[in-house]
From Swiss-Prot:
Probable transcriptional regulator that may help mitigate the effect of oxidative stress and help mycobacteria survive inside macrophages. Binds to its own promoter region. Homodimer. GO terms for molecular function: DNA binding. Keywords: Cytoplasm, DNA-binding, Transcription, Transcription regulation. This is Probable transcriptional regulator Rv1176c. Induction: Likely autoregulates its own transcription. Belongs to the PadR family. Contains an N-terminal domain (NTD), which harbors a winged helix-turn-helix (wHTH) motif that is used for DNA binding, and a C-terminal dimerization domain (CTD). It comes from Mycobacterium tuberculosis (strain ATCC 25618 / H37Rv). Coiled coil: none annotated. The keyword Acetylation does not apply. InterPro entries: Tscrpt_reg_PadR_C, Tscrpt_reg_PadR_N, WH-like_DNA-bd_sf, WH_DNA-bd_sf.
Length: 189
């Protein structure tokens, strides 16, 4: 996911200055997508040049003037396009739920689902779930082949096993969440 799309979702909810956006990011979208204040300001400038946002200067007495950004019609069109755009596929066993940007992308797309194509988002959720199942199957295969008796493990082998278990648990959790999301989206389609 590109930072501009997370910013567009946030601006759909409320016009904001760069500072206000950064604070709101820290309290909401920032739980699954992080950006520094500098990244947000840089991105806002690019988005303004692309006509995705409009800036209005607000005079402040005793303080520097501030720019308040609002999403434009072309910004809404870009957000809708991105929400409908399929996720980039991951290879099974690579880019697990612990590290894959697709899960973060889905979270931001869900946050902005009211501004896009929910049916397309549902398709992406079910496709991502299928990828997560493939990764889980890969991890379980490794577990079965390599760690047949976990109670006998120690040292480096135990540590490797524990990392693998973390990947398995993360995939299971991601699949459970994606099932919940798919069910909710299916009911509202």
């Amino acid at each position: 996911m590109a930072l501009p799309h997370a910013i567009l979702v946030s601006l759909c909810e409320q016009a904001s200055s760069g500072y206000e956006l950064a604070r709101r990011f820290d309290r909401s979208i920032g739980y699954f997508w992080t950006a520094t204040h500098q990244q947000i300001y840089r991105t806002l400038r690019v988005m303004e040049n692309n006509n995705w946002v409009r800036a209005t200067t607000v005079l402040q007495h005793g303080r520097p003037d501030k720019k308040v950004y609002a999403i434009s019609d072309s910004g809404r069109a870009e957000l809708a396009r991105w929400i409908a755009e399929p996720l980039s596929p991951t290879r099974p066993g690579r880019g697990s739920a612990l590290t894959d940007s697709s899960t973060r992308d889905i979270a931001v797309k869900l946050r902005g689902a009211g501004y896009g194509d929910v049916a397309a988002l549902y398709t992406q959720v079910t496709a991502l779930r299928a990828e997560r199942v493939k990764s889980l199957d890969t991890y379980r295969g490794i577990e079965k082949r390599t760690f047949a008796d976990p109670s006998a493990l120690d040292g480096a082998a135990l540590h490797q096993y524990l990392v693998l278990r973390g990947g398995i648990r993360a995939e299971e959790s991601a699949i459970d969440w994606l099932d919940e999301v798919a069910e909710a989206l299916q009911e509202k389609r």
